[in-house]
Amino acid sequence: MTVIKGKIVNHDESFFAEISFDKKINQIKKTSNITDDLFIIPGYIDLHCHGGNGYDTMEGWTSIEKMASYHLSRGTTTLLATTWTSTPNHTYEALKGFNKNLSTNSNLIGVHLEGPFINPNKLGAQPALTQKPSKEFIEEIKKIADIKVITLAPELDGMEEFVDYLNQNNIKVQFGHTLADYNCCKKYMDKFNIGFTHLYNAMSGNDHRNPGVLSAALQNSQYAEIICDLHHVSEQAIKIAKKCIPGLYTITDSIGAAGLKDGNYTFANIEIEKKREKVTLKNSSTLAGSVASMHTNFLNLLNIQYTIEEAVSMTSYNASQYLKLDNIGLIKEGMKSNFVLLDKNHNIIDVYLNGKKIDK
């Protein structure tokens, strides 16, 4: 059993305590003021991550495992490996062996399918390999990987029956890469708990005469993901979203260039350029995911004047509630021992996954 003393920070409170744990938290004993030299926060939860450190989900299990390890070293103790839009065969080959090889000591818990059922006129950096809604495709992927989330465009033909099928199979539906109007979104939101993918980006906007996906999200949604690298979304837009959406949570949308030096790279057959912590399609201004870590997002939230409790909420707790992951996202007796230790300047000291300190 391990014992640590420090300031525990949850989404709704902070207090000094001594915490005893192995795989789960056994005891939390509140103490008098120790120091602010050590913060203990819940491990980060990233529900949208394509890659990192030169590895990409679409390159198969070995790459998935290595990119997950990279993000674990930066505090992400729960992660969804996220696909790009591609051919059914490429996606299947990329995810083959996912469930078979998944370890109980991994930070991976499943996959997020970003596409291929998106609007070909709102691709962003996604390849032009969109598909029509297909239950058969989902059934094939379910045999090899646990699909937690899927991003799709609700305006596509055949989507109403498809969304109903996905909900029956406990797959969270998120709207993204879409040109749907407000009424189209609202129709689904009245029936299902719909999420939204990288809010503001690759979706119809908040036009006052022709409200779109963003309008529907800001007015009606309980949960949405947002990239807080401060390249995809401005400080002001983040704060507007947070006022409107109580369960707003940050994701990285990180690609394989995360952790690499500036230069040109190819991931999932997509040519990109990384320059000063920003990544675009080669010879284009179109953003192509991010190179942020969840810890980068956490620090950015603090820098734009969110409290540390609010930053914890947006980097861990809200995502846990969205996916109903009841044993993480909170430092409490009986919960998994997934947490990040920070110094007084909020630099990462150590990361614990299932009670084990990981090698960085």
Predicted segment positions?
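N-terminal metal-binding scaffold of metallo-dependent hydrolase/deaminase domains
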Residues: 1-33, 352, 356-357
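Residue-level marker for buried hydrophobic side chains located in beta-strands
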Residues: 43-45, 111, 174-175, 250-251, ...
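Active-site core of metal-dependent hydrolases
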Residues: 143-262
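Conserved, mostly hydrophobic/aromatic
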Residues: 37, 48, 113, 166, ...
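Active-site gating loops and adjacent loop-to-helix segments of metal-dependent hydrolytic enzymes
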Residues: 70-80, 120-144, 186-203, 213-221, ...
